Amino acid sequence: MPLKSKFICPFCFEEHKISDVQFRCTNRRCKDVPDLELTRYENGDESIPKMGKPTFKAPSGGLSIPKSARCPECNSITYAIVCPSCHNKLPESTLLGRDMIISVVGSRDTGKSHFVGVIVNELIERISVKFGGAMEGFDDTMQRYKAGAYQKLYMDMQKLDLTQSSVQNVNNGAYRPLIFTLKLKHKGLFKDKIDSYTLVFFDTAGEDLNDEDTMSTVNKYICKSAGIIFLLDPMQFPTVRNQLDENTVSRASSVDWKQATRSDDIMARVSKLIRNDRRMKSEQKIDIPVAAVFSKFDAIASLIPEGSTVLENSPHCDEGRFDMADWHNVDSEIRSLLSVC
């Protein structure tokens, strides 16, 4: 993996040069000081500043990535790196690996929280292992995931509550991403090498995607995404819903489909948000890959033609590689389903 010159903070999404990274003292005896950068990120009320250990830059090391720095206050060495803009602690893979901010977008009650909760568990327990790697949670990520989505979905066997809007309640944790480091082994010239990827997942309320002003405030991460998963609720398509019995529809949806924002409206706002951020013209093509994904697929399985690839188990993990033939088959089948929705 080539040496990075810049990185994107997985918390505030500002882009910085690697040489601008800061460190935070970890010596408990070092005096706490007001941290205005972290305060602005957390709640914006500078009259009640968050307190923390001092932050500072490492001496210039040329092209090399600084590994540590000495605190100018207490003279102790620290390895804790933080973002220069928001002072949140950063995973080492942010500097050394590839940034992979994954945005999951969709209207209210499409199942975004469930999708993130399940895909994270699949990556941890199955996918990373089958591909000869491992996925580790950063800081308190694993604790928050296990106590939240994992506990309710896998232990209590219950559905998750609808995510609260970050605008209505800034303390609900929705703005704090789940950050993981995915490590994958590959063959090098003389020995095996390990590539690391910083995976960043968000659980965003559907109503936070309903207008452009809100999106530009609480969904800035979309513009920095390495990929966008566009979640589609089949219950919100009349042609699909009319083929299902009323009980199936009511069990799968807690929001009246007539009140849900149209999927094409959300995608149009996402596109405009990215174009404005990048100052792109309307005729320019956005280079962020988008995957259209049907949620609640079990509810519509009876409507899928027998023998379809999407009804079969994915072969990727069993083979320990990405199966291009399977991908092409699934892609064409989902495109076909979308064309009749």
Task: Give the positions of each predicted feature.
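Switch II of P-loop NTPase G domains
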Residues: 60, 64, 175-228, 235-244
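Flexible phosphate/Mg2+-sensing switch loops adjacent to catalytic phosphate-binding sites
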Residues: 85, 91-95, 124-165
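Hydrophobic anchor at the beta1->P-loop junction of P-loop NTPases
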Residues: 102-104
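A conserved segment at the C-terminal end of the G1
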Residues: 115-125
